A protein has these predicted regions:
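Cysteine-dependent hydrolase recognition
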Residues: 1-140
Length: 140
């Protein structure tokens, strides 16, 4: 993981770096939470801030219609950032794009690893096995 991270920083993708300005938001439609917003409303606010900051596209994969396949296509095409808001477990997201460890290990986005903000319970619960956050870090 250390060598991968160093390589990622030292040798950026200069041939097709369009994915550096693309991202995704995966969200539930539950709430209200922060500032009285539902998760998908909160994600729309984050999306607009990123678009105002020169991102070219921020995919919206939200409940009730978001699917794992929709999220996988976006990730495999290349994303620099993923924002997630919803339920989580040690091995998965529960909403929007409800991916699990197996889905992450099947991705084909080698070299285009996103920065992930996961606002969910226990995705990083590393002390009881390979958790969801750790799976993302180990994925090739």
């Amino acid at each position: 993981m250390v060598n991968r991270t160093i390589s990622y920083e030292r040798y950026p993708d200069i041939d097709d770096g369009s994915w550096y300005i693309e991202g995704a938001g995966f969200a539930s439609n539950e709430g209200p939470g922060d500032d009285g917003e539902y998760d998908n409303e909160h994600m729309d606010i984050i999306r607009q801030k990123l678009l105002n900051y020169n991102y070219s596209d921020i995919e919206q994969v939200y409940d009730p219609s978001g699917t794992i396949a929709e999220g996988e296509v976006a990730i495999n095409d290349g994303l620099s950032i993923i924002n997630y808001t919803g339920h989580g477990s040690n091995g998965s997201w529960g909403n929007g794009c409800p991916m699990n460890n197996t889905n992450v290990n099947s991705l084909t986005n080698t070299g285009m690893w996103p920065w992930i903000w996961s606002v969910a319970c226990v995705n990083g619960e590393f002390h009881i096995g390979t958790c969801f956050a750790e799976t993302w870090l180990r994925a090739t």
